[in-house]
From Swiss-Prot:
NCBIfam families: dapB. Pfam families: DapB_C, DapB_N. This is 4-hydroxy-tetrahydrodipicolinate reductase. Belongs to the DapB family. Its main location: cytoplasm. CDD domains: DHDPR_N. It is found in: Cytoplasm. It catalyses: (S)-2,3,4,5-tetrahydrodipicolinate + NAD(+) + H2O = (2S,4S)-4-hydroxy-2,3,4,5-tetrahydrodipicolinate + NADH + H(+); (S)-2,3,4,5-tetrahydrodipicolinate + NADP(+) + H2O = (2S,4S)-4-hydroxy-2,3,4,5-tetrahydrodipicolinate + NADPH + H(+).
Length: 274
């Protein structure tokens, strides 16, 4: 690829939005074409680079994708489930690819976005960090070797501002393990415990959630048997790891046909056996 990929970023003034703007500035393969914020924001017209603390980028914050329709090829969206569905619909109507890092979707919203994959290229992933996507491969191996003989728990922690729980990454961890073991996560997941719960059912996958301070993201899968336990952990120390993954996804996505893709495909991990 010789030409830069032009991207637009929604939620440009938020914590993740500003990190995405910074990542775009640092990536030689990316050109920031637009930064979108909610209508009525006091930040309209502010230079996106100045807002992100990386110096002027000559891209003013705007409140409409329509105003920026000619300025980008890939939309990068880390907003809310409701907003992401609206943004994906807009992309489908305007022939734009989209990278979605939003989490907290319900089943119907996931189905809506999946349907748009018939019209445009979409990367949708609950976590775009390279290490997390490698962790999912490791979980397949651990589940295959140990899953039927031990207790499985998933523990995740995030900052106090995160709105959904468990995190999309934690749920994906559970899905990977359950699928490897031939289980249905909707039937075997246990979300938190309280009171007299009785003896643990080995066929379940437990989830525990921490929300505190400024934790960027920590995820651990615990495979515990009598006499030993295996812990597979990923800790993110900066949102930049997610932002860099999104930029990588954008540069990959412009070369793809319409379809719904994930970061495993972006990173070439599909079909790899560890």
């Amino acid at each position: 690829m010789t030409e830069q990929v032009r991207v637009a970023i929604t939620g440009g003034s938020g914590r993740m939005g500003r990190t995405l703007i910074e990542a775009a500035k640092q990536n030689e393969l990316i050109l920031l074409g637009a930064a979108i914020e909610r209508a009525g924001s006091t930040l309209m017209g502010v230079d996106a680079g100045e807002l992100a603390g990386v110096g002027a980028m000559n891209v003013a914050i705007t409140d409409s994708l329509d105003k920026a329709v000619d300025d980008f090829d890939v939309l990068i969206d880390f907003t809310s489930p409701e907003a992401s569905v609206v943004h994906t619909d807009w992309c489908a109507r305007n022939g734009k690819a989209i990278v979605i890092g939003t989490t907290g979707f319900n089943h119907a919203q996931k189905e809506q976005i999946s349907a748009y994959g018939d019209q445009i290229p979409i990367v949708m992933a609950p976590n775009m960090a390279v290490g997390v996507n490698l962790m999912w491969k490791l979980l397949e191996v651990a589940a295959e070797v140990m899953g039927d003989y031990c207790d499985i728990e998933i523990i995740e922690g995030h900052h106090r501002y995160k709105k959904d729980a468990p995190s999309g990454t934690a749920l994906k961890m559970g899905e990977v393990i359950a699928e490897t073991l031939g289980r249905d996560l909707e039937k075997c997941a246990v979300y938190g415990r309280e009171g007299i719960t009785g003896e643990r059912d080995r066929g379940t996958i437990g989830f525990a959630t921490v929300r505190a301070g400024d934790i960027v993201g920590e995820h651990t899968a615990l495979f515990a048997d009598i006499g030993e336990r295996l812990e597979i952990t990923h800790k993110a120390s900066s949102r930049m790891t997610f932002a860099n993954g999104a930029m990588r996804a954008a540069t990959w996505l412009v070369e793809q046909d319409a379809g719904l893709y994930d970061m495993q495909q972006v990173l070439g991990l599909k079909g790899i056996t560890i």
